UniProtKB/Swiss-Prot annotation:
Basic residues biased stretches: 60-71
Domain of life of the organism encoding this protein: Bacteria
Entry keywords, A to Z: Ribonucleoprotein, Ribosomal protein, RNA-binding, rRNA-binding
GO biological process assignments: translation
Bilayer-crossing regions: none
PANTHER family: 50S RIBOSOMAL PROTEIN L4, LARGE RIBOSOMAL SUBUNIT PROTEIN UL4M
InterPro entries named among the record's database cross-references: Ribosomal_uL4 (IPR002136), Ribosomal_uL4-like (IPR013005), Ribosomal_uL4_dom_sf (IPR023574)
Family: Belongs to the universal ribosomal protein uL4 family.
Protein name: Large ribosomal subunit protein uL4
Gene: rplD
Length: 207
């Protein structure tokens, strides 16, 4: 099994921790990562675009001129699509851009991305992130102790409320629980910091 260093909050090493090879030693799969990112970005689209068709445009209830005898083409409404100010034909309507992607593909994408972080030494495991109260300054101190200055993804458990509150106001820092780990935030992060308890939960879900 792959092993990485285990750190304390003060930046000192506290032994090593073994990683599950079925999660953190997976061969890079760019195809799965691409599909998963595409699907997640599509699901984030609001899809609230809309235009007015001829029934939604104000006015146009009266026939503009009589059917016959004027020499002009017959018309039934000045809000028909051929008129300036008329309704739009086949315009965009509100819809969801989300689509299904097999769960195994989504999990493979995350495992592939996590494995690359481990292989590139961008994966830091700490024995815990314990704070007596939410303090952004204290969390920033932990980042300095761990020599982390780049864009970082912090993974903590649901019980680590003070850590979540302490980190969420820091720039270039994203805080999630194991259930919130997804392909976008893993790929976007330049480094991942994860607590030992959160690591166990991630392995339990993905293994």
């Amino acid at each position: 099994m792959t092993s990485v260093a285990l750190f304390k909050q003060d930046g000192s090493q506290n032994g090593t921790v073994e990683l599950n090879d079925s999660v953190f030693s997976v061969e890079a799969n760019e195809s799965a990562e691409f599909d998963a990112i595409l699907r997640q970005r599509a699901s984030l689209r609001q899809g609230t675009h809309a235009v007015k068709n001829r029934s939604a445009v104000r006015g146009g209830g009266k026939k503009p001129w009589r059917q016959k005898g004027t020499g002009r083409a017959r018309q039934g409404s000045i809000r028909a699509p051929q008129f300036r100010g008329g309704g739009i034909v086949f315009g965009p309507t509100p819809r969801s851009y989300n689509y299904a992607l097999p769960r195994k593909v989504r999990q493979l994408a995350i495992k592939s991305a996590l494995s690359q972080k481990v292989a590139n030494d961008k994966f830091v495991v700490v024995d815990g992130l314990n704070f007596d109260a939410p303090k952004t300054k204290e969390f920033a101190g932990v980042m300095n102790n761990l020599k982390v200055s780049e864009r970082v993804l912090v993974v903590v458990t649901d019980e680590d409320k003070n850590a979540q509150l302490s980190a969420r106001n820091l720039p270039k820092t994203t805080v999630v629980t194991p259930a919130g780990v997804n392909i976008l935030n893993v790929v976007d992060a330049q480094k991942i910091i994860i607590t030992q308890s959160a690591l166990s939960q991630v392995e339990e879900v993905l293994a």
